[in-house]
A protein has these predicted regions:
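NAD(P)+-binding Rossmann beta1-loop-alpha1 motif at the extreme N-terminus of oxidoreductases
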Residues: 1-63, 69-73, 100
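Internal alpha-helical scaffold of NAD(P)-dependent oxidoreductase catalytic cores
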Residues: 93, 104, 129-140, 158-206, ...
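Rossmann-like NAD(P)(H) cofactor-binding subdomain of soluble oxidoreductases
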Residues: 65-158, 174-176
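NAD(P)-dependent Rossmann-like dehydrogenase/reductase catalytic/cofactor-binding core
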Residues: 208-212, 237-247, 251, 255-345
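Short, well-ordered alpha-helices that flank and scaffold nucleotide-derived cofactor binding pockets
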Residues: 21, 25, 52, 99, ...
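Generic structural signal for well-ordered, non-membrane alpha-helical segments
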Residues: 12, 16, 43, 94, ...
Length: 345
């Protein structure tokens, strides 16, 4: 990859904005970091606030953004001449967004996904959707995932993450663009495993949030987290991921952060559902997408196609689809036949 120069970030929510701030404050040498980052926002008032006041008043109102960040509402303008295009829109909008802008993206641009959800209907991971919508080859695609709660990153709290690409060179280039005083990227080539870890943890976080909303204790939540990791690992292996990825930042790390933090959208949505709020009402009460609710049916469908047993995900899918009362969920979360422990069990 030549000098990064200009970066486009599609999506000015909390994570897209925080990631733009990470790239804008990279401590990598000149030539390995971006000169300018342009956020794309659907809303004019947010774009103007970012460009003129260097703040995102809707999603990160108390965070000062680097001076090299601006925002626009014209998506074609955002990606024009960008060496790197970062995708930070909800999973169900990735295909539509990229199809719209396909002809404006440079042929040699690297596409980076921050998306943590499966596309409903196709069951495709973000990397597959990007490849289908843009025709981007694997060596020009990367995914960033890990215990990356946007507000903590924007505050400058120490965080580690994973940059995965089938091309080690591409992963290293994106890692260099994001490395900073408090942001430490690691690289690997397991795109599938990294994506599955980021996708399924949202479903497990819903389950933990429901347990919390029902007043269940730490034993219950720890059990769900641990067995949730096991079923995530089973699915990752079945679709081509590596088990060691699930023991790292993109698996265990992301799962723990998302299940434990009150900043987690999915845990928060689960907690609301656990207190008796309807799923639609819980979704409507949140500013941003809880990807677990949107993706759980696709996760379950993918698991069934590969004959992978995922009892926690199955139970959450039943709740989200209205086939199971939340009051009966706790009895089902760990209701499997007795067997030995392990991700293959």
């Amino acid at each position: 990859m030549s000098r990064p120069g200009r970066v486009a970030v599609l999506g000015a929510g909390s994570w897209g904005t925080a990631f733009a701030a990470v790239m804008g404050s990279s401590t990598s040498p000149e030539g390995r970091r971006a000169d300018r980052i342009v956020l794309w926002s659907r809303r004019r008032e947010i774009a103007d606030a970012i460009t003129l006041g260097h703040r995102n008043p809707e999603y990160l109102p108390d965070i000062d953004l680097p001076e090299n960040i601006s925002a626009v509402t014209d998506i074609h303008q955002a990606v024009s001449d960008a060496a790197v295009v970062v995708v930070a829109v909800p999973a169900q909008h990735v295909r539509e967004t990229l199809t719209t802008v396909k002809d404006s993206i440079a042929e040699d641009a690297i596409v980076v996904s921050l998306v943590k959800g499966l596309e409903r209907g196709t069951g495709e991971r973000p990397s597959q959707v990007c490849a289908s919508a843009l025709g981007v080859p694997p060596e020009r695609f990367a995914v960033v995932s890990g215990p990356n709660l946007a507000l903590e990153i924007a505050r400058g709290e120490p965080t580690a993450t994973v940059v995965a690409s089938e091309s080690a060179e591409t992963a290293e280039a994106i890692a260099a663009m994001t490395a900073g005083r408090t942001f430490r990227p690691y690289t690997n080539t397991d795109v599938v495993g990294v994506e599955i870890g980021g996708i399924v943890k949202n479903v497990i976080a819903l389950a933990v949030g429901i347990c919390d909303g029902q007043g269940l204790g730490d034993n219950s939540k720890a059990s769900v987290i641990t067995r949730g990791l096991a079923e995530t690992t089973r699915l990752a292996i079945a679709v081509g991921g590596r088990p060691e990825t699930m023991a790292g930042l993109a698996g265990l790390g992301d799962l723990v952060a998302t299940c434990a933090s009150p900043l987690s959208r999915n845990r928060s949505a689960g907690r609301l559902i656990g207190t008796g709020m309807g799923v639609d009402e819980a979704v409507a009460s949140m500013k941003q997408t809880a990807e677990g609710i949107k993706s759980v049916s696709a996760v379950v469908d993918l698991a069934r196609r590969h004959d992978v047993e995922m009892p926690i995900s199955e139970a959450i899918n039943a709740v989200v689809s209205g086939r199971l009362e939340v009051a009966t969920l706790a009895d089902l979360l760990l209701s499997r036949n007795l067997k030995s422990e392990g991700h293959r069990a």
